[in-house]
């Protein structure tokens, strides 16, 4: 039995496998866990976090691994105060209203709405509607591509990328060398503006609830560095697990974990085991 695992995420690789396997995944605030010794993909977006059975387990693992070790210059030691007995009703909570209202192609919408009802009616959480900044987030996706090309430059120039398993990544690494420096710099300038707008959204709340696979949350928060906790909240008719997410303010990992923990006290989806023969769900919004 595996008690926990450690994942790395650049754009979905903690939240996506956690969802697919019916477990709880915590992608921390950027810089809260040292990445020393881990393979780089995007220096400005890579994050390391726990993947566990429950939010409380994630909190315990995170408490052990967070902080600077002097080997990763982006890592910071910021106090992490985990109290599973704190009243979750003291949190200022929002929900991504527009994302929950979009019915088209939203096959797990009823499960997500049931989670919102449980938060309100069973736990007593008061939630206010919030919206992500209206911004062309997709236009900044090539930041990851450019940084991945830099991270794997030696592999590409040596020709050893031909030894990789057949996929799109070798060509991605090669073509990244054609991205103009001006475009990369301007994309990061736009990213900084987006971070400022996102901070305004979080100004009056500690955490917001959002669909994991809709609303652009995964891509947006990996650009801004905000923490996200994805927890199981139901299954498809075929037995495929689904999840819902809790996004915290910067360095408010404890708050996001607390709200996730509170929901897991009134539900048992995190204790169930997915059917290993279940059909896989469609690919999430970018998973690296």
Each predicted region: which residue ranges?
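A short helix-breaking turn/cap at a secondary-structure junction
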Residues: 24-110, 266-288
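Short connector loops at secondary-structure junctions
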Residues: 125-140, 171-173
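Short amphipathic alpha-helical coupling segments at ligand-binding clamshell hinges
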Residues: 57-61, 111, 187, 240, ...
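Short helix-loop capping/hinge segments that flank enzyme active sites or metal/cofactor-binding pockets
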Residues: 87-96, 142-195, 232, 236-243
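Short glycine/serine-rich loop segments
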Residues: 1-65, 222, 226-245
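Acyltransferase
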Residues: 106-131, 152-160, 184, 188-205
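Short, well-ordered beta-strand elements
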Residues: 50, 240-249, 256-260, 264, ...
């Amino acid at each position: 039995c595996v008690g926990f695992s450690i994942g790395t995420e650049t754009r979905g690789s903690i939240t996506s496998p956690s969802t697919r396997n019916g477990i709880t995944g915590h992608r921390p605030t950027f810089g809260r866990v040292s990445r020393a010794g881990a393979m780089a993909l995007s220096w400005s977006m890579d994050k390391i976090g726990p993947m566990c059975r429950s939010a409380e387990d994630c909190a315990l693992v995170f408490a052990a691994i967070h902080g600077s070790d002097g080997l990763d210059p982006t890592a910071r030691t910021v106090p992490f105060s985990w109290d599973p007995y704190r009243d979750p009703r003291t949190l200022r909570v929002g929900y991504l209203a527009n994302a929950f209202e979009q019915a088209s192609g939203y096959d797990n919408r009823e499960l997500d709405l049931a989670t919102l009802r449980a938060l309100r009616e069973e736990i007593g959480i008061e939630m206010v509607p919030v919206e992500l900044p209206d911004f062309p987030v997709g236009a900044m996706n090539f930041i990851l591509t450019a940084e991945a090309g830099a991270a794997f430059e030696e592999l590409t120039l040596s020709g050893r990328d031909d030894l990789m398993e057949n996929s799109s990544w070798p060509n991605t690494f090669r073509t990244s060398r054609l991205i103009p420096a001006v475009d990369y710099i301007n994309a990061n300038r736009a990213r900084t503006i987006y971070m400022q707008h996102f901070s305004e959204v979080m100004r009056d709340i500690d955490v917001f609830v959002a669909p994991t696979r809709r609303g652009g949350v995964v891509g947006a928060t990996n650009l801004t560095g905000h923490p996200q906790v994805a927890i199981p909240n139901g299954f498809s008719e075929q037995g495929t697990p689904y999840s819902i997410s809790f996004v915290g303010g910067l360095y408010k990992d404890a708050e996001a974990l607390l709200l996730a923990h509170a929901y897991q006290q009134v539900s048992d989806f995190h204790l169930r085991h997915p059917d290993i023969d279940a059909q896989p769900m469609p690919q999430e919004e970018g998973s690296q």
